[in-house]
Each structure stands twice: as structure tokens, then as C-alpha cells.
Design a protein with these regions (language model features):
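Beta-rich carbohydrate-recognition and catalytic domains
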Residues: 1-50, 58-111, 115-169, 177-228, ...
Length: 263
């Protein structure tokens, strides 16, 4: 996000399966959008979690900062979202975190995307079914609204997978823009469980935040390497009218980089 003349970026650090998974979340800042200096780090041990997923950083109307953290409940397929708040990102303290999206015995909740417009907070969060552990990789994006960004009212599924398409196994919204009367969302999709961690990016549109419809029959973007993963795309509007994109992309060796483009 852009604040006080700088770009602040929240991201997670991840090791391969069996070697730690998402072991930390970092917040860094930059003056050019490409070269970042770390501001703070939160490690998975501090959050009593098996893994940390993509975080989300917001600023409240009173100027304070919030970092929403997706946490894997140890020994389960369950996910929850906690939040920490501080006057500045450098002051985030994991000891002050509290749960805002607990999920339940049937649903894991993670990867919130949050947009505040006026007095209303909009959120799209990824939900995973827990009834059958073998199917827990399936995902839909549900929408919720709030007046404070802490207590949320759920309104149901906004975007799900499409049978027979490249995103049939699930859809995870990663970025949302309000453009006049149209809502444009970017999302991760996959067709099979084997494509977990190698999702590709699609685009969906709608006129209401509660209902988004995928556009086209093919992904918008993917990596040319290995499993083809290009995911967690986010879009930042700059003061000069250009946009900066950030996304995770699979490299030739199978590792994932965080990359940026200026458009």
C-alpha cells in the first residue's frame, strides 16, 4: 500500500513442504516500489501456527496500521485469521494479536483481501472445506462487510470454481479494485489438487461485491516455468496514474519469486 510517500509491502517467507512452510511474515518499505527495506518480522512460532500464509496490510481512518495474519492451526487443515494493530508497521507486536476470523470445525478461513470505502469495509476471504481432509485444498472466496474491520458479517460465496475449467478446483481472490460501477477482481485458480501451490491468475468482474463472475475460459497470466504458478497478484495505483503489480511467480528451478511490474 502507498502511505506517507512510501510503498509498504507485506509478504510471507516460505520454505518447501517438510522444511517449515510459511515460517515468517515481513513488512518492508520502499520509495521506488522495487528496492525494499524490512520494517518488521513476525515468525510462525510467535503465532502458535504450523504455517503463515499471505498477510494483508491496511491503514485505518485514524492513521493506525493493521496486519491481518493467516495462521494454520497446528496438526489440522484448519486456518484462522488474526490481526495486530500499531501506530506504525515497525511497532507490530505479535503478543497483541487477536482472532478476527476464527473459521469453525467445517471451514478454514485465510488470505483476506480488504478494501475500505468511506465508512464501509469490504472483505473477500478464502474458505476451505474441512469435512474431508483429502478435499481441503478446494476453495471458494466468500464476501463479508464490516464497519470497523474487526467484526464481520458474512454474505456467502462471491466467487467459486467452474466445473470443467482451469479453475474448477477453486478460486481465491487476491486483489479487488472498484472502477466506477464495476468491481474488478484478480484471483488464483487451479483445476486439480496437484496444482496446489502452482495456481494461475484469472480476472472476475461484478457490479456488487457479493457476486463476481470469472471472465473468459483461460487464465489471464501464468509462469512459463515448472508448474506454471503465477499467483497472489496485487495491484497498486500510483499518484501519476500508472499501476504497479506485485505477484508470486514460479522460477525455472521450481522456487517462487516475488516480482513487480510497472504499467
Amino acid at each position: 500500500m502507498l502511505a506517507d510517500g512510501e510503498i509498504f509491502l507485506a509478504y510471507r517467507l516460505r520454505r518447501p513442504l517438510g522444511h517449515g512452510r510459511g515460517y515468517a511474515v515481513a513488512v518492508a518499505r520502499s520509495t521506488d516500489g522495487e528496492h525494499f527495506d524490512p520494517v518488521t518480522m513476525i515468525y510462525k512460532e510467535e503465532m502458535a501456527t504450523d504455517s503463515l500464509e499471505r498477510p494483508y496490510l491496511v491503514r485505518t481512518p485514524d492513521g493506525s496500521w493493521r496486519l491481518y495474519l493467516s495462521c494454520a492451526t497446528p496438526g489440522t487443515k484448519h486456518w484462522r485469521v488474526e490481526v495486530v494493530e500499531a501506530a506504525h508497521p515497525s511497532e507490530f507486536d505479535s503478543r497483541r494479536s487477536h482472532v478476527v476470523l476464527p473459521g469453525d470445525s467445517k471451514t478454514g478461513v485465510k488470505d483476506p483481501v480488504i478494501v475500505r470505502r468511506g465508512d464501509e469495509w469490504h472483505m473477500w476471504a478464502t474458505c476451505h472445506p474441512l469435512d474431508d481432509p483429502a478435499e481441503a485444498d478446494q476453495m471458494v472466496t466468500e464476501y463479508a462487510c464490516s464497519t470497523d474491520g474487526i467484526t464481520w458479517t458474512w454474505a456467502g460465496v462471491a466467487l467459486g470454481g467452474r466445473p470443467g475449467h482451469w479453475d474448477s478446483r477453486g478460486a481465491r481472490v487476491t486483489s479487488v479494485c472498484f472502477d466506477g460501477g464495476t468491481i474488478v477482481a484478480y484471483y488464483d485458480g487451479r483445476a486439480t489438487a496437484a496444482e496446489n501451490y502452482e495456481e494461475r491468475t484469472g480476472v472476475a468482474i461484478g457490479t456488487e461485491p457479493t457476486v463476481l463472475a470469472a471472465v473468459g475460459t483461460e487464465p489471464l497470466a501464468w509462469s512459463p516455468y515448472h508448474g506454471g504458478g503465477l499467483r497472489y497478484l496485487d495491484l497498486l495505483s500510483l499518484p501519476d496514474g500508472r499501476k504497479r503489480l506485485y505477484y508470486e511467480m514460479t522460477r525455472p528451478d521450481g522456487a517462487h519469486d516475488l516480482r513487480t511490474e510497472l504499467q
